[in-house]
Amino acid sequence: MLIFPLINDTSRKIIHIDMDAFFASVEERDNPKLKGHPVIIGSDPRLTGGRGVVSTCNYEARKFGVHSAMSSKEAYERCPQGIFISGNYEKYQAVGLQIREIFKRYTDLIEPMSIDEAYLDVTENKLGIKSAVKIAKLIQHDIWNELQLTASAGVSYNKFLAKIASDYEKPHGLTVILPEEAEVSLAPMDIAKFHGVGKKSVEKLHEMGVYTGADLLKIPEMTLIDKFGRFGFDLYRKARGISNSPVKSNRIRKSIGKERTYAKLLYSEEDIKKELTLLAQKVENSLTKHDKKGRTIVLKIRYADFSTLTKRKSLNLATQDKEQIERTAHEIYDSLEEQPRGIRLLGLTVTGFE
C-alpha cells in the first residue's frame, strides 16, 4: 500500500499580498468623486446592448451582489446606480509594476500570481528582519504611503495558508496563521474556499459528505487517494495545513484561457458567437491581470456526443485585446466545415506569449 510521507516544513516565512479591489481602487484614487459610490470595471451594458463582463468592482458594488466575471447586464440589474468604467489596463499594469518594485525592497523571492497578487518568501530577506508580520506591515505601509492603495496580507509558513489568511480580513487586513493554529483555522472553512480545490473536486467531496475542513480531516488518506489519485494526498495534507510548494520567482505561464460548459446545448450561430464574445472578454480580463499578450488564439468545441475539436490561428502581432480575440474566434468558427450539431462546451485560449 502506497503512503506518501508527511513532511511539514514550518520554518518558512511566506507572505501573500492581495491588492484590494485593485482596478476599482486605482480609479477611485485618481478620481476622488468616485469614493462612496459603487464602481464597476466593465462595459456599460446600456452602451453595448447588454454585452460585456465585469472585470472587478469596489466593495460598495459588492454589497449589491456584484462580482467579477458577472455579466455587465446582471451587474446593472443588481446595481443600477453603479458607475461603469471600461478600464485603463495600461495604467493598472504600470501601478502593478510599482507594487512589484516595493516587494523587491524586501526579497527577490517573489511569485506574481497576477498583476495584483503575489507570494513573497521572506525567510531570508534583504533587511534581515526576523518577523514576517513586520515585513507585511511595512509593505502595506509603503503601498499606501506611496500609491494611496490598500492591500490585504496573509502570513504563514506555506503558500496555501498565506493565501487563505489574506482573505480573512479585507480590505487592508493582516492575518497570521501559525503552525499550531492551522487545523483549527481550516476546520470551519467551506471546502470550496480551499485554494487549489476546483469545482469538480468540490462536487466529488460533497458526494463523500465533505463540506468543511473538519469533514476533510476525518477522511482516511487511502480513501482520498483512491478517489482522487495523487491529488487525494494533496487534499489529505491541505486539511492538516501541510503544503511545501516553493515560492517560484521564475514562474512561467504558457497560456491563458476560459471555457464554459452549457446545461442546454448551443445550436444557433447567434448564440455560439454571443458566448464566444463573452469568453473573449473574460480572456482579455485575465490576460490584463497577468500582464500577458499572445500571438495564437485557440478555439475548443465539445459537441453533444462529447467529441472535441480544437483549432488555432496565429496572429502577426501579440494581443490581449478583446476585440481581436473575439474577431479571431469568430473567424475560426466560420472556417469550420462541421455539420450543425449541439455544442456542450466552448473554450478560448491565448498562447504564444511574448
Curated annotation (Swiss-Prot):
GO MF terms held by the record: damaged DNA binding; DNA-directed DNA polymerase activity; magnesium ion binding
Keyword DNA damage belongs to the record: yes
Gene3D superfamilies per the UniProt record, alphabetical: 3.30.70.270, 3.40.1170.60, 5' to 3' exonuclease, C-terminal subdomain, DNA polymerase, Y-family, little finger domain
GO cellular component: cytosol
Residues under site feature: Substrate discrimination: F23
Family affiliation: Belongs to the DNA polymerase type-Y family.
Protein name: DNA polymerase IV
Organism: Streptococcus sanguinis (strain SK36)
Lineage: Bacteria, Bacillati, Bacillota, Bacilli, Lactobacillales
